[in-house]
Amino acid sequence: MCESNAYLRKPGVEDSIFLEMVDRVYNQEDDLVLEDIFGRKKIIKAKIVELALVDHKIILVEK
């Protein structure tokens, strides 16, 4: 499988998992919408700060 996991980064804290097995990421106005392989969606006011493609990681920071 080639899905990535999305992590939320906060200062001084280890990155925490936000959503596993992410299949799609897209903008919806000021939000990011992440959808997993089962069609579950999570919406967050955040920006992508890093895509680690080999490690299958999407790193987010809240706006």
Located regions from the model:
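Compact, glycine-rich, soluble single-domain proteins
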Residues: 2, 6-63
